[in-house]
A protein has these predicted regions:
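Structural signal for hydrophobic packing residues in well-ordered secondary-structure cores
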Residues: 1-4, 37, 119-123, 149, ...
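Histidine/acidic residue-rich metal-binding segments in metalloenzymes
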Residues: 1-65, 78-96, 113, 153
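Conserved, mostly hydrophobic/aromatic
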Residues: 10, 45, 59, 66, ...
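Short, acidic/turn-prone active-site loops that include or flank metal/cofactor-
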Residues: 13, 70-75, 102-103
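His/Asp/Glu-enriched, well-ordered alpha-helical/loop segment
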Residues: 33-42, 87-176, 189-191
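Short glycine-rich, flexible loops that bind phosphorylated cofactors or substrates
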Residues: 53, 74-75, 105, 176
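Short, charged, surface-exposed secondary-structure boundary motifs
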Residues: 76-81, 108, 178
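Active-site microenvironment of metallo-dependent hydrolases
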Residues: 139-245
């Protein structure tokens, strides 16, 4: 509150959080956090898969945002399609953004692939093709994320007075042809590999799919070197089931 920056934390991805809070505090996580005054409209909570209806009501009442991370939920088997209440959160007016969590959990940070999953998971889970249409998923990935960071007056959409954050896709690619329904193709067909140019606050940072602010080749080499060094220090066995040539 003193610095006006809000808070963000990861909570209730799996059963461990509610079980631990019930044992230690006698309440589920969101109820406990509300009682001690943590839940406010400048708070963004990542995951929120294992929440019950009472917690959902408290989240809606306090105005918190949720960063939905479908990729991690699927890989780590949080049960998001079985118990996740993201459709109910949306209907309750809770602001939903999309996250990619940590790469050690989700294995990638391509927001577009995560948006694809947001558009699809609950269609199947609830057998309802109207769940999270492409337009809603796109809004979550843009304005939803901006609201979660309390930055909706600066970013999240192309409007006069906001920062010029622009992503341009190369549409001469298989996922874009024939070019018919742009929003459907953006969410259901495209991913980060088709990005050609990126502007951040009006400054071009990507062109022809390559970063302009760093030496990419050197960066990839450093990533490989660092990864191999960490693996060697860990002493953990190689889990690859296929030979690598």
């Amino acid at each position: 509150d003193e610095h006006g920056v809000g808070m963000s934390f990861h909570m209730s991805p799996a059963k461990l959080d509610p079980e631990g809070f019930l044992e230690e505090f006698g309440h589920r996580p969101m109820i406990h956090l509300a009682e001690i005054g943590v839940l406010k409209d400048d708070v963004s909570i990542t995951h929120c898969v294992q929440v019950d209806n009472q917690e959902l009501a408290v989240m809606a009442e306090t105005g918190v945002s949720v960063a939905h991370c479908p990729t991690t939920a699927l890989k780590v088997s949080y049960g998001v399609t079985q118990v996740g209440k993201m459709p109910e959160m949306a209907m309750a007016g809770i602001n939903l953004g999309i996250g990619t969590d940590g790469n050690n959990a989700s294995n990638y940070s391509d927001l577009m692939r995560a948006t694809y999953l947001v558009a699809g998971l609950f269609k199947d889970a609830r057998t309802d093709p109207q769940m999270f249409p492409a337009e809603k998923a796109y809004e979550m990935a843009t304005l939803g994320g901006a609201r979660a960071m309390n930055a909706q007056d600066e970013i999240g959409s192309l409007e006069v007075g906001k920062k010029a954050d622009v992503v341009l896709h190369d549409t001469d690619r298989p996922e874009w042809r024939p070019l018919l329904n742009v929003m459907n193709q953006l969410v259901w067909s495209a991913d980060g590999r088709g990005v050609h140019t990126v502007f951040v606050d009006g400054t071009k940072v990507v062109e022809a799919g390559r970063m302009l602010t760093i030496d990419e080749d050197r960066f990839w080499a450093q990533c490989q070197e660092a990864g191999e060094a960490i693996t060697a220090r860990s002493g953990l066995p190689d889990k690859s089931k296929y030979p690598v040539l």
